[in-house]
Amino acid sequence: MPINETASVTNCDTNFEPLIENLKLFLQLCYLTPSALFLSRVIYITAWKYRKKFRKQRFYTIFLADCVTGFILVNFSIFFTRPLIYVPQACEFVLEHIKKLALFLDIYYPCFRYLQAFQILVQILFVANRASCVLWPLSYSLFWKKWLKSILTTMAISPCLWIWTIAISDKMIVHGYGGLVVLYYRYVSWARSTLFFSILRLTSVITIVVATTTMLIKMSRMKKRIRESERRLCWASVYLSVCYLLPAIAEFEYFLVLKAKLFENSGILHGLVVICWDIQNICSTYVM
């Protein structure tokens, strides 16, 4: 689809100090770049070097799916999303060549939003897997061995029920801090991506809270009846639940600020949402 030039900005925002914005980029790259390298190493170990060992444990299949998704999202941030936002010096060049970016944006933005949705689904599955380990220790291995491929396939297809509206819509460029941000101009009025994401995020929060609470209660009663290795994985999923809830809390606060039209605070909260998404992208690997 072509760039929507009517909705897109035609000039750069000069209200931000370029060097300050560059510093923001540098600070974010300081944790994003090592995280990308670390994620690539983990993916190599689990998917290739010791694949025979990890393939037997269905939990690590879910973990690998989360790592691969996070790795792609982190690289999107490093090589495109963040430089576009925090390098105001490139703003004029991008706007001058905006038409040449149409094909790239048609591929990048739907993929970016698809991966965000898929990651949330995988993280729901992540917590559900650990909860089932505690609740049904005798049968959970057989269940996940039988159904995991089908569940992951369903989860991989599910975001497409929403992504199509982004894929067919015009993309547009708007101001983001001193730089630019990619959005889309909705072509089908009733197909609202914000509604889909709200439902997905709400489902995620409810599932994570219920599963984690149930798991903690059950673990406190099981004592030594659960293997120490499984117990550690369960505690790891508790820590991950906190990481997964952070973006939900930040997004809710951001929504309230926009609804109240307190736009002077929206920039800070938008930055907080971005950081919380970074935490979600990389936390599972560091915790594990």
Swiss-Prot record:
It comes from Caenorhabditis elegans. PANTHER family: SERPENTINE RECEPTOR CLASS GAMMA-1-RELATED, SERPENTINE RECEPTOR CLASS GAMMA-RELATED. InterPro entries: 7TM_GPCR_serpentine_rcpt_Srg, Nematode_SR-like. Its main location: membrane. This is Serpentine receptor class gamma-1. It holds the Pfam family Srg. The chain crosses the membrane at residues 25-45, 59-79, 118-138, 148-168, 197-217, 238-258, 268-288. Keywords: Membrane, Transmembrane, Transmembrane helix. It is found in: Membrane. One of its GO terms (cellular component) is membrane. One of its GO terms (molecular function) is transmembrane signaling receptor activity. One of its GO terms (biological process) is sensory perception of chemical stimulus. Belongs to the nematode receptor-like protein srg family. It is a multi-pass membrane protein.
